[in-house]
Structure formats: structure tokens, C-alpha cells
Amino acid sequence: MAIEHADVLRAAHLARVGLGEDEATGYVDDLSRILEMVDQLQAVDTQGIAPLAHPLDATQRLRPDEVTEHNQRERFQACAPVTEGGLYLVPRVVE
């Protein structure tokens, strides 16, 4: 799949990214090379190869799932300017 100059400008417009004509030309080349690499990857025969969840066959050592911090809600809410019913009241941002 070939990327054209108009495709780059349209993508920039949709992403709300300011992009000059000279910058777009550079991105056309870069994106075309990226898509060529993707095409090469898709051409590889992966039949019979199990999918990987992670490229390394290592297990992660996890710490025990123990409570290390206790509930301090009342202490933290005492510092807040306004609370009600255990909730923090904040100024309205969206009308």
C-alpha cells in the first residue's frame, strides 16, 4: 500500500496536527517505508507457530498480596476543604 501526500495531509487534519507541505513530504517517505516493513512481516509464514503473549519465556516473581496500607479516609478527608457523605466535593467544571 502506497501512502500519498494527500493521505498524510488528511491524517494530520483528522488528528488536528499542524503539518506543513515540506513536513508532509518527509512523512510520506517515512510512512511508506513503515508500511513496506509491515507487508514484509505479513508475508512471513507463521502457520503452526503458537502465538506469544510475551517474547520472553520468563515468569514474573510477584510479591504476596497483602494489605500494607490501612484505610485512612477520615484522616485524608479532614484535610479536604469540603466533604459530604465520605466524598470529596469539588467545584463544577462542566456545565
Curated annotation (Swiss-Prot):
One of its GO terms (biological process) is glutaminyl-tRNAGln biosynthesis via transamidation. InterPro entries: Asp/Glu-ADT_sf_sub_c (IPR036113), GatC (IPR003837). It catalyses: L-glutamyl-tRNA(Gln) + L-glutamine + ATP + H2O = L-glutaminyl-tRNA(Gln) + L-glutamate + ADP + phosphate + H(+); L-aspartyl-tRNA(Asn) + L-glutamine + ATP + H2O = L-asparaginyl-tRNA(Asn) + L-glutamate + ADP + phosphate + 2 H(+). Transmembrane segments: none annotated. Keywords: ATP-binding, Ligase, Nucleotide-binding, Protein biosynthesis. Its EC number is 6.3.5.-. The keyword Ligase applies. The keyword Ligase applies. One of its GO terms (molecular function) is glutaminyl-tRNA synthase (glutamine-hydrolyzing) activity. Pfam families: GatC. Belongs to the GatC family. Allows the formation of correctly charged Asn-tRNA(Asn) or Gln-tRNA(Gln) through the transamidation of misacylated Asp-tRNA(Asn) or Glu-tRNA(Gln) in organisms which lack either or both of asparaginyl-tRNA or glutaminyl-tRNA synthetases. The reaction takes place in the presence of glutamine and ATP through an activated phospho-Asp-tRNA(Asn) or phospho-Glu-tRNA(Gln). Heterotrimer of A, B and C subunits. This is Aspartyl/glutamyl-tRNA(Asn/Gln) amidotransferase subunit C. It comes from Chromohalobacter salexigens (strain ATCC BAA-138 / DSM 3043 / CIP 106854 / NCIMB 13768 / 1H11). The lineage of its organism: Bacteria, Pseudomonadati, Pseudomonadota, Gammaproteobacteria, Oceanospirillales. The gene is gatC.
